[in-house]
Amino acid sequence: MYSPSPAPEQRFSDRVENYVRYRPSYPQEIITLLQREAALTPQSVIADVGSGTGISAGLFLRAGCTVHGVEPNRDMRKAAERLLTTDPNFHSVNGSAQATTLPDHSVDFIVAAQAFHWFNTPETRAEFTRILKPGGHLVLIWNERKLDATPFLCAFETLLLTFGTDYTAIRHENIDAMALHSFFGGAYDTFTFANEQHFDFEGLQGRLLSSSYAAAAGQPGHEAMIAELHRIFDTHQVSGQVCFEYDTRVHVGH
């Protein structure tokens, strides 16, 4: 194990390039779902909180929405600005879940994709109530990597349990239905979509190193971790590729 865990707003500063290249996108079906269930339109204003490098923001921008990407990590925020700067509907915001800096009752949707597990729930809920328009929607999204659907995914999970610095402590699977019910303040609906990525070894390594709990080059355990990753890839690859399978969970409430 290496140095103590960095603060959430600093965790991904040295992971940005891999995050941009190798993290999964989100299924287009999410837009269709929100159009049907929550009256999403091209006129909708979105606060994408914990927006990172802009992966989720891009989904809503392609639907014609206005998106305020709220991100406390400077390096992640700058990456999103580079990727999305040509879209006039994207607005980069230096803020956090507890202090978005957005005006009162100014957004139709608050979206948190792959980010809710970093939030301070009571303070975040108060801030979300402040910026959300009456009748607006909260949308929490996760790409949940399947842990044991295939022998490859089982082996990859074992690698994370062996080499991940604080993997078990920060994984979003730790968030249970009670925490979600408390955050939404009542009822919410959950929807699931299939998602997947295919990687050669370079992509698999980049996907691993995009995670804040994976030892970076020069840190203790890195070389042993990459050696094990090579072994796993060589064992399970088919035509030079392995497949990451995800369940994309979408929780919708108010």
Task: Give the ranges of each region predicted by the language model.
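A short acidic, Gly/Pro-enriched loop at the edge of an enzyme's catalytic core
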Residues: 99-109
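A short, conserved alpha-helix within the catalytic core of class I
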Residues: 119-128
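Conserved Class I S-adenosyl-L-methionine
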Residues: 53, 174-254
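Conserved catalytic/acceptor-binding region of the Class I
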Residues: 129-197
